[in-house]
Design a protein with these regions (language model features):
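Generic, low-specificity signal for short hydrophobic/alpha-helical stretches with a mild N-terminal bias
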Residues: 9-13, 25-27, 59, 71
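Short, structured protein-protein interaction patches enriched in aromatics and acidic/basic residues
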Residues: 22-53, 57-64
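Histidine-centered metal-binding segments
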Residues: 35-36, 94-102
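C-terminal structural segments of small proteins and small subunits
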Residues: 71-98
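A broad, low-specificity signal marking well-ordered, structured residues that form hydrophobic/aromatic
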Residues: 3, 27, 87
Length: 102
């Protein structure tokens, strides 16, 4: 499976991973809900479970993805500082309409 993160996201995720509560845990991207042809995603700290694939990114951060969820394959984790701070997780390989902000 595939996952990409931009530089800002890597910085923020590294900070999250260096906290005490993150000890021994990894970043998981998961689907909050599906709408037919696209999904909404979120992230949390978690430990690998039976069906997970640990996906290496080019930013030295490993991301947990449930290998049974085809919509998780190819997710893009981005972090923006403007117009407001926050993560945007999209999957362009699965979304027919290009991307949209929520």
């Amino acid at each position: 499976m595939n996952c990409k993160i931009n530089r800002n996201a890597a910085k923020v995720l590294k900070k999250m991973l260096s906290t005490e509560e993150a000890e021994g845990k990894m970043i998981r991207v998961y689907i909050t809900h599906m709408h037919g042809d696209h999904a909404h995603y979120d992230m949390k700290l978690d430990t690998p479970a039976e069906y997970d694939e640990i996906v290496k990114t080019d930013k030295d951060i490993d991301i947990l993805l449930d290998s049974r969820e085809e919509f998780l394959d190819g997710v893009w984790i981005k972090y923006f500082y403007v117009p407001e701070e926050g993560f945007e997780i999209t999957n362009l390989s699965k979304e027919p309409h290009g991307h949209h902000h929520h």
